[in-house]
Amino acid sequence: MRIILLPQPHWLIGKEGRSEVESGEQRRTVFAILLAISFSHFLNDMMQSVIPSIYPLIKEKYGFTFGQIGAITFAFQMTSSVLQPFVGWYADRRPQPYSLSVGMLFTLLGIVLLSFANSFLLILLSVSVIGWGSSVFHPSASRVAQMAAGNRNGLAQSIFQVGGNGGSAIGPLLAAILVLPFGQHAIAWFALAAMLASATLFRVGVWYKRELHRFTKKAQVVNSRVAQFSHRKINIALALLVVLVFSKAFYMSSMTSYFTFFLIDKFGVTVRVSQLCLFAFLTAVAIGTVVGGHLGDRYGRKYIIWGSILGAAPFTLLLPYLNFPLTILTAIVIGLVISSAFSAILVYATELKPGRVGMVAGLFFGLSFGLGGIGSAFFGWLADHTSIEFIFHVSTLLPLLGVVAGFLPNIEPKRKVR
C-alpha cells in the first residue's frame, strides 16, 4: 500500500517552509465561513427582532403597560445573557462544533410558542426560550468567526455582527408586512428561518470540527501581544470596556424598545411608519458595524471605541428637540456612529484574554443583552411614571460615558491591513 502525501496549500506555507498556522504569521481569511456565520446571525437576530416589533400589537391586544413591555424584553435578554459566559467558557474548554445547529432549535421552539401565546406569562416563556437559543449561538459563533478571521479579527467580527444587525433591521420591516396585518399567529412563518439557520450551522460545524487544532495554535501565538500587561492593568481595561458596553447597551435599549412609541407619541405617526423609521435606524446600525470593524483593523480599536460612543453624544443630545424629518436623519447618524463600537470592543477584549474567545465573547454579548434588558425594563418603568418623551431626555446622556475609552491602554496604536 502506498501513502501519498499531498502538499499543503500555498497560503499555509511560511517563508522558511513552516506552516503559518503553526508560526502565527499571515493566515487567509475564510470568507465562506464568515458569510455563513453572518447569514445565520442575520436569520437569528431577524427572528429575535420580531419580539420588540410586535410590542405595539400585543400592548393593544392584551392591554399591557409599558412596565410589562419592559419585562418581556428583560426576560428575553436576561435568559440569553446570563447563560452566554458559561456557554462560551465551556466552548473554550470542550468545543462542540454542532452545538450551534442544535441551539437554533431552541429559537425555533420559542418562535412557534410566541405565535400562539395568549397571556403575559406564556409570552414571557416564549421569549425566554428564544433567549436560550441566543445564549448558545452568540459565543460559539463569535469563536468560529475568530477561527476564520486569519489576521483580520476586526473585519471578521464585523462581518459576523453585520449579519445580526441586518437581521435586526429587516425584522421590524417583515413584522410590519407579515405580522401587523395578519396578527400574532403569522409569527410562526419565522420558524422557516430557524430551520434554514440550523441547516447552515450544521455545515459550519463540519468546518469547525476540522479546524479546531489550528485555532488552538493561533491562540497560543496571539497571547504574546499582551504579555507586557499586568493582570491588574488587564482587569482595569476590561472594567472600562464594561462601562462602555453599559452606555451603549442602555442607549440602544431606549431606541430599539421605545423609539417607535416616541415617534407615535410626539409626531402622531402610524405604527407602520414608526416601524419603517426603526428599520432605517437599524439599517444604519448594520452599516456602521462593518465600517467600525474595518477601521479598527486599520487605525487601532481604542480610537474607534472612543470616537464611536463619545462621538454619538452630540447627536443623541439633539434628538429630542428636532422635528420629524430631522429626528429620523439624526437617528440614522446615531446608528452609524454608535454601532461601530461593539466589534472593536469585542476584539479588543479577546486580545486582552487570548485563548478565551468563547468566554470573552459570551461575557460581552451577555453583558450587552443583559444590560439592554435592564435598560428596557428601567425605561419602561420610567415611561409609565413620567412620559415616553422624558426617557429620551434621560437616555441621551449615556454616550457621554464614552470619555472613559481614553483611559484604555494602547494594544496596537496604529495598524494597517493591506
Regions picked out by a protein language model, each given a short descriptive name:
Residues 296-345:
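C-terminal transmembrane helical hairpin of 12-TM major facilitator-type secondary transporters
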Residues 82-121:
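Conserved MFS/SLC helix-loop-helix module at the cytosolic interface between two early adjacent transmembrane helices
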Residues 51-52, 235-286:
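Extracytoplasmic gate region of multi-pass secondary transporters
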Residues 160-209:
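Helix-loop-helix hairpin linking two adjacent transmembrane segments in secondary transporters
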Residues 49, 77-85, 168-169, 282-290, ...:
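Residue-level signature of mid-helix packing/kink "hotspots" within the transmembrane helices
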Residues 126-163:
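Cytoplasmic helix-loop-helix junction between adjacent transmembrane helices
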Residues 190, 203-227, 416-418:
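Flexible cytoplasmic inter-helical loops of multi-pass small-molecule transporters
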Residues 63, 95, 116-121, 150, ...:
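Helix-breaking motifs and short loop linkers at transmembrane-helix boundaries and internal kinks
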